[in-house]
């Protein structure tokens, strides 16, 4: 087992009192991949997670992370736009970005880690003609044919060396669900700061480690997310780069929405020593919850097969914690993303199916992976006339 004291915090360099939250070998190096055969899934590349929480600034990171194990290709699929709840969240965040620019001012938008440009395009759509330029950065981008007029995406990581690719008139910088994938937090924060200028506002969205610990959401620790922030730790990191920020909880507490800017006067954020109670709460509750779920699976599968609903990151981790080559209490995983159906989850090899297929397999228990989607999933099950028992993880 790794000693947490041997792991200096990447943000504040603290080594005193750091807490080892979770250590798991043989986890998939990528979550959001759907493999065509079970053999491919079982042989998928693996890594180790060693999740450590800083006792000083509360940052959580994977001390065993190796970026060489991460390689995004055409099998990567993190599309969750089949959820009305998530689409409403995207709309709300896009509207916040638009509202940050006065109504009589054109929007010149920049996005760092823009993926296929989906959020960029959404902001353009909802800005109703106000967006006059859009600049994105993402090395995996392939969607030129889907970009709105006036948009350009550079297929490279953004760094202080290519600030000249940002138009001088840019007034909004956005980076959603990128920072948690970056192990070199100091260099990435330097790049974010380099993108700033007087009159620009930066928006960052990323998971909140406090929510994970408070809800004992052990399924939210996985290899891709090597850097998980709290309100305190993101303030400290950005302050080190001369930025001040406000942090708000969004997505029913699972994410943070960070609004950063250049301060009018120099300032700094001192880490507030974080109580270890939250981490200890997580450790104790995790042991109890794992035991309870093991018993629950034994009881329910004696009646009928059990399925998870949610074939994204949470479902991949949860299935891996309970399914093995020797025992598979989880029969299958349901996902509305048609591109995943008929495929298999990395490492666990659990099959991904449509709701209709799960029903036809005789599934009698459905466990919802994300409580945010409970209402729409329950409605879907009712409309199918399916009498499955429903349980909600972290609900």
State the predicted function of each range.
Residues 23-31, 220, 248-266:
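Conserved catalytic loop of SAM-dependent methyltransferase domains
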């Amino acid at each position: 087992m790794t000693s947490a004291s041997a792991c200096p915090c990447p943000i504040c360099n603290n080594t005193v009192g750091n807490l080892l939250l979770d250590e798991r070998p043989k986890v998939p190096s990528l979550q959001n991949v759907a493999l065509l055969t079970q053999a491919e899934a079982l042989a998928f590349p693996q890594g180790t997670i060693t999740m450590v929480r800083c006792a000083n600034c509360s940052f959580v990171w994977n001390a065993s992370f190796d970026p060489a194990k991460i390689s995004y290709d055409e099998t990567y699929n993190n599309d969750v736009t089949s959820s009305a709840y998530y689409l409403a969240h995207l709309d709300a965040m896009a509207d916040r970005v638009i509202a940050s620019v006065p109504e009589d001012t054109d929007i010149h938008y920049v996005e760092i880690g823009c993926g296929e440009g989906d959020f960029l395009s959404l902001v353009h759509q909802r800005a109703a003609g106000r967006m006059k330029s859009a600049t994105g950065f993402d090395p995996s981008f392939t969607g030129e044919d889907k970009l709105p007029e006036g948009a350009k995406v550079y297929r490279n990581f953004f760094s202080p060396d290519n600030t000249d690719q940002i138009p001088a008139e840019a007034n909004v910088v956005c980076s959603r669900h990128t920072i948690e994938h970056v192990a070199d937090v100091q260099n990435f924060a330097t790049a974010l700061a380099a993108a700033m200028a007087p009159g620009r506002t930066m928006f960052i969205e990323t998971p909140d480690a406090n929510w994970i610990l408070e809800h004992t959401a052990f399924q939210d620790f996985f290899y891709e997310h090597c850097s998980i922030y709290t309100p305190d730790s993101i303030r400290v990191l950005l302050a080190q780069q001369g930025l001040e920020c406000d942090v708000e909880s969004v997505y029913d507490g699972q994410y943070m929405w960070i609004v950063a800017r250049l301060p009018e006067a120099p300032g700094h954020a001192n880490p507030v020593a974080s109580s270890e109670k939250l981490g200890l709460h997580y450790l104790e509750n995790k042991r109890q919850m794992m035991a309870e779920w093991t018993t629950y699976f034994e009881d329910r599968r004696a009646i009928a097969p059990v399925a998870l609903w949610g074939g994204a990151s949470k479902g991949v981790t949860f299935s891996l914690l309970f399914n093995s080559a020797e025992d598979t209490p989880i029969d299958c995983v349901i996902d509305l993303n048609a591109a995943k159906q008929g495929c298999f989850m990395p490492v666990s090899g659990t099959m991904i199916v449509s709701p209709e297929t799960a029903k036809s397999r005789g599934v009698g228990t459905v466990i919802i992976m994300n409580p945010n989607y409970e209402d729409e999933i329950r409605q879907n099950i009712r409309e199918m006339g399916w009498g499955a028992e429903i349980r909600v993880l972290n609900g």
